[in-house]
């Protein structure tokens, strides 16, 4: 059997504390929805920069150099 350490006991108590439990109600859905919206906004901004429909002053996009 392995040796018990203070760090191992601490990590075990943190890691297994919520295993198998389901949070009642909405849980983490609002947090995940917010993160999803942020990701969507980020992707739309990238698409607009790629299509040059988002005009940025002093920033030129040259995709010919990217290979």
From Swiss-Prot:
Disulfide bonds: none annotated. This is Photosystem II reaction center protein H. NCBIfam families: PRK02624.1. Its main location: membrane. One of the components of the core complex of photosystem II (PSII), required for its stability and/or assembly. PSII is a light-driven water:plastoquinone oxidoreductase that uses light energy to abstract electrons from H(2)O, generating O(2) and a proton gradient subsequently used for ATP formation. It consists of a core antenna complex that captures photons, and an electron transfer chain that converts photonic excitation into a charge separation. Gene3D superfamilies: Photosystem II reaction center protein H. GO terms for biological process: photosynthesis; protein stabilization. Keywords: Membrane, Photosynthesis, Photosystem II, Thylakoid, Transmembrane, Transmembrane helix. HAMAP family: PSII_PsbH (MF_00752). Belongs to the PsbH family. It is found in: Cellular thylakoid membrane. The chain crosses the membrane at residues 27-47. GO terms for molecular function: phosphate ion binding. The keyword Thylakoid applies. InterPro entries: PSII_PsbH, PSII_PsbH_sf. It is a single-pass membrane protein. It comes from the Bacteria. The keyword Nucleotide-binding does not apply.
């Amino acid at each position: 059997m392995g040796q018990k350490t203070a760090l191992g006991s601490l990590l075990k108590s943190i890691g297994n504390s919520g295993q198998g439990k389901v949070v009642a109600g909405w849980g983490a859905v609002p947090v995940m929805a917010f993160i999803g919206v942020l990701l969507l906004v980020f992707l739309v901004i990238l698409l607009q920069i790629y299509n040059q429909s988002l005009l940025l002053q002093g920033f030129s996009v040259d995709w010919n150099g990217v290979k």
